[in-house]
Amino acid sequence: MPATDDATLAVSVVVPACGRMDLLDRNLDALMRQQFDPQRFEIVVVDDEPNHNTLHLVAGWRTRTLERGPRLSYVANSGPSGPASARNRGWRAARAPIVAFTSDDAVPEPTWLSEGLAAFQDGLDVVCGRIRTPVPARPTEQQRSARVLEEADFTSANCFLRKPVLERLEGFDERFNVPRGSDADLHFRLLEHGIAIGRAPRALVVHPVRPAPWGASLLQIRHAVFDALLYKKHPALYRQKIEPRPRWDHYLIVATLLLGLASLLMGLTIFATLAFAAWLLLTIRLCAHRLRGVAHTPAHVADLVLTSALLPPLAVFWRLTGALRYRVRFA
């Protein structure tokens, strides 16, 4: 590995890792193929689940690129786990004046660094590149949801920030200890501090969508608890950019279900029948909305049909849990 003086470094690339060896290996391969002087950038891999496998993978890449690659370092995240915490460990260990963030499951194009840095002009402190998520014409619901990254105003899978800005804002809020909320929170704080965000559309990162297990939406909905924290910190921006109004359809579905159960317990058969009929119609409406424009394979349709009955109660539970946990009026 060529000797790298701090004064020659232009950018530090921070890659949070969480035990996905094959994805991290692919990511490092893409970073080693950057069309950028290897003496002008470094790679900081932050292991969010410290283990020997990640350490050995990084060591293997360091050995193979000893003479021609950039400086590659391994940082174990010994603090609170989560992507926000890992990114904070990474940028604090970075030696360059600009920090580039990407993800272990992302694949930066060869010109990613050069195009991203070229966009730093006119006093810009923050630049966002472009994300491409390849999905089929008839995607699964998970794949369709992942495509929102292509239109995101800010994502840590492809962004560049001057280190003083990160120091000023104290980086990512580590209370968001899941892959939800921390990117939006930092984006909103940048906006609130009047920090302009430049665009580098040719700084491209490909973000393949991993296969999701059956019923994945039921596991992911628990992250909605952090929506309350994001709303508490940035109520106006939350309503402007994320959710203009509460998901009243979920609350209505839960209300009709509870009304039906209560009526049944009280022996009010007619009321129970009407309430359950309303619940069924609303659930069918939700399911039809989720099925629109996605793959209609038997397994995927069965997934959406069954989870449509369970999602509203879980969503309401986790949102109200967040409201109580963070002491905010949030629905």
Label every PLM stretch briefly.
Residues 9-12, 42, 185:
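Cell-envelope/extracellular polymer assembly enzymes that use nucleotide-activated donors
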Residues 99:
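Short aromatic/hydrophobic "clamp" motif used to bind/position activated sugar donors
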Residues 178, 184-240:
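Catalytic donor/gating beta->alpha subdomain of glycosyltransferases that bind UDP-sugars
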Residues 144-161, 168, 177-179, 185, ...:
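A recurrent flexible, glycine/aromatic-enriched loop bordering the glycosyltransferase active site
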Residues 74-94, 153, 157:
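Glycine-rich, basic loop-to-helix element that forms the pyrophosphate-binding segment
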Residues 1-33:
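N-proximal low-complexity "stem/linker" segments adjacent to membrane-targeting elements
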Residues 29-76:
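Acidic donor-binding segment of Leloir-type glycosyltransferases
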Residues 107-139, 208:
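Conserved donor NDP-sugar-binding/catalytic core segment of glycosyltransferases
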